[in-house]
């Protein structure tokens, strides 16, 4: 039997200078915990069963009203479990970032297990002077158990619009049975990747602050001129100013541990009082 797709809703508004959840309707398999963090709102995603079980479907609409400050993270890696009957696990998140609002979407990696099928769609709309930071993070299975690119299919899509105009449309599909993931044109010996998108007017103070930190971290972790090629292969990345509204980082690595320091340093920067005012990864190992 195909599971019904039930539409979940989150609304975040500013009340007396503080961002709070003012409306929610959440259905299985999704769980969301709301944490109070000074003037910002911190929402933590989780799942019943610790991940996506065959056929699970999440359809979530997020409305972050004007002047709100919100962070979305996860309890742990998002695991996609084995599909015994060829059913797809699917996640669709449609979000609005209101005027002068800030949203930081910073979850842990998606980890597709052997024989799993996963499809993800992230759609965000930005209003005037809104800022959005999105992290899209992936690891190719239970690497420590020797499982690597053993899933059946993985698809992810991110689309961002600003004032009704698309400024990001990023799509990526992996089908290991049809493609050689160890090819130099794919992952070679890497098993993890991370994409970071910063969207918002480049003249905004928040955008300048986050972009400066991203450039600093890119200079620290990525190298344009490599002397020792064997060392360079553990992590490869690039930082690109796409246009006046988008700054982007792409990075792949041999394993997730090599990407953790980059993300943790970025999360720590979010504790600036002009941004979130707290670290969404605080307390992590």
From Swiss-Prot:
A GO MF term: nickel cation binding
UniProtKB keywords: Chaperone, Cytoplasm, Nickel insertion
Gene Ontology cellular component annotations, sorted alphabetically: cytoplasm
Main subcellular location: cytoplasm
InterPro entries: UreD
Localization of this protein: Cytoplasm
Subunit field text: UreD, UreF and UreG form a complex that acts as a GTP-hydrolysis-dependent molecular chaperone, activating the urease apoprotein by helping to assemble the nickel containing metallocenter of UreC. The UreE protein probably delivers the nickel.
Membership in a protein family: Belongs to the UreD family.
Role played: Required for maturation of urease via the functional incorporation of the urease nickel metallocenter.
HAMAP family for this protein: UreD
Protein name (Swiss-Prot/TrEMBL): Urease accessory protein UreD
Organism: Cytophaga hutchinsonii (strain ATCC 33406 / DSM 1761 / CIP 103989 / NBRC 15051 / NCIMB 9469 / D465)
């Amino acid at each position: 039997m195909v599971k019904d797709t039930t539409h979940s809703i989150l609304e975040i508004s500013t009340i007396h200078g503080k961002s709070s959840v003012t409306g929610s309707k959440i259905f299985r398999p999704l769980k969301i915990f709301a944490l109070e963090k000074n003037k910002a709102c911190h929402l933590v995603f989780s799942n019943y069963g610790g991940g996506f079980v065959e056929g699970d479907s999440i359809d979530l609409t997020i409305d972050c009203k004007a002047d709100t400050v919100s962070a979305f993270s996860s309890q742990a890696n998002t695991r996609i479990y084995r599909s015994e009957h060829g059913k797809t696990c699917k996640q669709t998140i449609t979000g609005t970032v209101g005027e002068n609002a800030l949203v930081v979407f910073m979850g842990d990696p998606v980890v597709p297990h052997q024989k799993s099928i996963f499809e993800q769609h992230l759609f965000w709309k930005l209003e005037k002077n809104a800022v959005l930071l999105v992290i899209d993070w992936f690891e190719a299975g239970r690497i420590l158990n020797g499982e690597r690119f053993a899933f059946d299919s993985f698809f992810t899509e991110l689309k961002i619009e600003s004032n009704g105009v698309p400024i990001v449309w990023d799509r990526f599909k992996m089908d290991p049975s049809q493609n050689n993931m160890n090819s130099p044109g794919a992952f070679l010996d890497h098993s993890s990747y991370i994409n970071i998108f910063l969207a918002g007017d480049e003249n905004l103070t928040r955008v300048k602050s986050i972009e400066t930190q991203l450039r600093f971290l890119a200079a620290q972790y990525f190298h344009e001129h490599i002397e020792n090629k064997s060392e360079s292969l553990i992590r490869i990345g690039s930082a690109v100013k796409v246009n006046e509204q988008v700054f982007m980082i792409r990075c792949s690595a041999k394993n997730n541990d090599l990407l953790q320091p980059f993300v943790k340093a970025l999360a720590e920067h979010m504790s600036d009082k002009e941004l979130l005012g707290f670290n969404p990864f605080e307390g992590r190992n």
